[in-house]
């Protein structure tokens, strides 16, 4: 395999997104090991190189065609796209799909003593943020003028330090805000991790590998969202039991040895089977109910 046909994928060097990205690729059958002292990891079984970089470098590397694919938070991607559009730099990439991890929200927050009605309450005030472009777009859409205070980290301490009147920062549980005497007022952007691809023309070999990886990602995520359900059911309540299985399509119904009054049902459900549903199934005569995770799915 020539160097030009090796697929280059950028992932975050460290942090939760890095861990989840590595796990996703391994679930897709990509075998690799990470040396913390090196920025590049070579896959053992596929022509794939993983570049471990800062998260805010990933969109630019993909947009400039330095790497072929990247796994990145949508918030970081959109922040970079707005910045590049402002500077008339290449800002295009293909967003292949949203992933099932990296959930976060970008929110406005103010000190607990601040009387907040809506975003207009921040008119003319100073707001600290690490996402100036997303904040600017939101405030422009609202017709609100403000002063910004750009910080690369520890945004939540800005009001207490006298640097800003409020903040715009990523929020998960809100515990950090509370610890710093702040409260969340408004969500301006919701984000998940996503896979992006360079818009530059790929060789047929490399594009085939991209398509293979994406197909496997789709299968892994579909499997995570599904459960395999097995149970025994009386034939007289079969239709009612099948109707109770959440998200199940065309379950397999098999006869049981030496029992003409009961059957075995196998089904893939796209929703969780909650305890109350299992109790309803039991009330209809179902028994030996098993709900199991699915590792992989295809087709």
From Swiss-Prot:
It comes from the Bacteria. One of its GO terms (cellular component) is cytoplasm. Coiled coil: none annotated. The keyword Nucleotide-binding applies. One of its GO terms (biological process) is L-histidine biosynthetic process. It is found in: Cytoplasm. GO terms for molecular function: ATP binding; ATP phosphoribosyltransferase activity; magnesium ion binding. Its cofactor is Mg(2+). It holds the Pfam family HisG. The keyword Hydrolase does not apply. It catalyses: 1-(5-phospho-beta-D-ribosyl)-ATP + diphosphate = 5-phospho-alpha-D-ribose 1-diphosphate + ATP. Keywords: Amino-acid biosynthesis, ATP-binding, Cytoplasm, Glycosyltransferase, Histidine biosynthesis, Magnesium, Metal-binding, Nucleotide-binding, Transferase. Feedback inhibited by histidine. It is an enzyme of class 2 (transferase). HAMAP family: HisG_Long. Catalyzes the condensation of ATP and 5-phosphoribose 1-diphosphate to form N'-(5'-phosphoribosyl)-ATP (PR-ATP). Has a crucial role in the pathway because the rate of histidine biosynthesis seems to be controlled primarily by regulation of HisG enzymatic activity. This is ATP phosphoribosyltransferase. It comes from Shewanella baltica (strain OS155 / ATCC BAA-1091).
